[in-house]
Amino acid sequence: MNIKSLLAKPFASVVHRQIKKEQLTAVADQQSILNQLVKAAKGTQFGKNHHFDQITDYTSFKKAVPIRDYEGFKEYIEQIKKGTQNVLWKGLPLYLAKTSGTTSGIKYIPISKESISNHISGARNAILTYMSGSGNTDFAGGKMIFLSGSPELERVGGIPTGRLSGIVNHHIPQYLRGNQLPSFETNCIEEWETKLDKIVDETLGKDLTLIGGIPPWMQMYFDRIVERTGKPVIASFPNLQVLVQGDINFEPYTAKLWE
């Protein structure tokens, strides 16, 4: 067992215990967080338009802020894209996450400096909870491939903008950088087929233990591995143990990925 696997065990246990403890106060914690968010945002355009200064609990919040889709936020988003401050949150967002635009066009999702750590800790804690629950930490010392969008960002209204997975790539903890694949240069390739071939070049022959990404990207990667080697994926990566996915429904891809 390598040093990272040894260190991961006690750390995973501590995090898992803390999560289980927080489950006991989940409802009260949500009310507390709601109060904090409403208080912090009451001076924004959105807060003023929705009378945040009069919100005292979840019931009054629900009445003041009805559920809406992206179109209901679009007028606010357009202002943010022009560099207007204090629209949905204090100041300007740290990033704008841009969707692929496959349904209803490209959408821009503000990511505040207060929230970016949650994107990282959520994924980290999921893995640590798995470690604690299963007792399996061996994979922590192997190579980990994260299939993501390009980490290269453009600026919209002065705000760094790009795919959420590319944004998160900038915040991967330093202790995982040595395990991370593919390289930054390969991740920056925009054309998917070219990028996929480069990822295969960089990962074949490596001791891959974890893969993360959205199901269709993982499926295409595995298909390319089989195409390149003529062998099942497990023959190329016998120590591959953990698959981390998100963003879309996994079920339609289950049969193919488990082949």
Task: List where the protein language model places each region.
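Active-site phosphate/ATP/adenylate-binding loop shared across adenylate-forming ligases
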Residues: M1-D29, L34-H51, I55-E259
